[in-house]
Amino acid sequence: DFIEKMSEYTASGKIYNRISSSLLRAFDGLKQMLDPIKEAGLFELRIYEGQNEDAVRRKIKMFNEEEITLFNKVGLPPIFFSKMIVGPYQPSLVYMLNFRDLEHRNETWNTFINHPEWKVMSSKEEYKNTVSNIRKIFLEKV
């Protein structure tokens, strides 16, 4: 039965470019996925790569102890925060935010990066050099 169904599935030609799988572990600061905001139309998946495991550990600490709170304060609506256990771009962490649209996203990020609490936390010595590369993937609601 599986083989028969598989032939129907692949008969339509190219279905996708590639498949990539990952295993993620939730941060202590947000242990469960949250529902998107009601008017969500844009999702931003962010992958923060670290130069080594210690850099990622320190960035996760920053999120758990300070940054997630500030995200909520300025209205950066999260879906999840996680450490990548298995997958590409290791060592890394992955999180997803959601917005009404690109304008809402840009306004909210601007509020965040100009917030006095962000300026203080991002200048702390323990959080220096925690991210070596940021990958952003934008997804639209269909």
Task: Describe every region a protein language model picked out.
Residues 1-118, 126-142:
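Short S/T/G/P-rich N-terminal loop/turn motif that feeds into the first structured element of a domain
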